[in-house]
């Protein structure tokens, strides 16, 4: 069965930070001197992010310290911030609501009734709870209680593409199979305290959001977005360059300065080989949906593949407006490109711990 991406839905927290507000908040995590504070604020200005949604915000306006109560200023240089158990408590409350909203929008966009869903794939790397987001979606939207569930957990920013691979594998020839893939990420629950370069980069980029897509069998319409293929590549000698680990005070990311260099040096050879398996060359790809791990990641992809900056415009827009929402981000980008009627074939690329490249071909 050819999987068709029949409808997308997205959801964001009610309130948002500006990047300048977050720089001020995070400066309070570090108890830093004026020199380091200038360095931190410069990093935030260069991040490509303008605003970010966060479930920790309780009010839209007013003084920053009155709008949220989850994070406190560091008491001293050894203060690690909220415990992971406290962060997971917020995840358990907020993630199901956000995911259910995105899933409902995707079903409406695809004009698919909730009772028609046969398979549900949930994706998240920013929290754990059981019963989980899947059960909340089934009960909240009235999906059949026989819906087959799979959770793709802790795979990082490319997780939604792994989720689509799972949905694609459900297509065993039955035209009645309808898959709902839903990603929800609450990255702002993992803001880190202290002065650590990797943590500073993560604090400057990541945000909250949820996105969903409905997959069904093709009906022969020429305007359908069909999955033409998927691929994956574990970059050699890169195990320590991007990591995501559970700590006592939040999940902690390692993001080395080598990541853009690795992408620029390793991506082209694999993409050329993968596209050839589908009788395509890089020049044949009409549009690109690239996960914006940050501005340098986008630039590295453009240089590696020899494509114009214009091909990353939607990715940069999503990064600026919403920040890096981990695995949900690529679905935000695909949703926007589909609404813009982006030309095909389209290739989606996302990167995660490993370092791993995941790819999706849409025809």
Which residues does each predicted region cover?
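Short beta-strand segments
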Residues: 6-9, 123, 153, 178-185, ...
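Active-site-adjacent elements of ketosynthase-type condensing enzymes
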Residues: 24, 129-136, 181-201, 231-247, ...
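Claisen-condensing/thiolase-fold acyl-transfer catalytic domains that form or cleave C-C bonds
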Residues: 90, 100, 107, 125-127, ...
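Short, well-ordered amphipathic alpha-helical segments that serve as non-catalytic structural scaffolds
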Residues: 45-49, 94-110, 210, 262-277, ...
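Conserved beta-ketoacyl condensing-enzyme motif
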Residues: 43-142, 282-298
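Glycine-/small-residue-rich "gating" segment that lines the acyl/pantetheine channel
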Residues: 144-165, 172, 186-220
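Condensing-enzyme catalytic core mediating Claisen C-C bond formation in acyl metabolism
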Residues: 1-90, 191-265, 269, 341, ...
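Glycine/charged-rich beta-loop-alpha catalytic/anionic-binding loops adjacent to active sites
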Residues: 82-83, 114-119, 141-153, 193-198, ...
